[in-house]
């Protein structure tokens, strides 16, 4: 009910590739009811392309870091085994 509305809070949010507008309605009957409204702006196509390019760059960067840390960890493990064999044999 409109009479039970305590406050309305708007916050802009980008979720995935869509510009989202969250409308939170606080009422006496419910503690909080979230209504999600998706707003499409004039530059939504540009936003979608920008987000996809940024996701691709970020995913590639994360993959490279993971690959490097995996190789480095494997190298340290092999080095540990070699040094252990050397110290045992001496």
Swiss-Prot record:
Protein name: Uncharacterized protein RP550
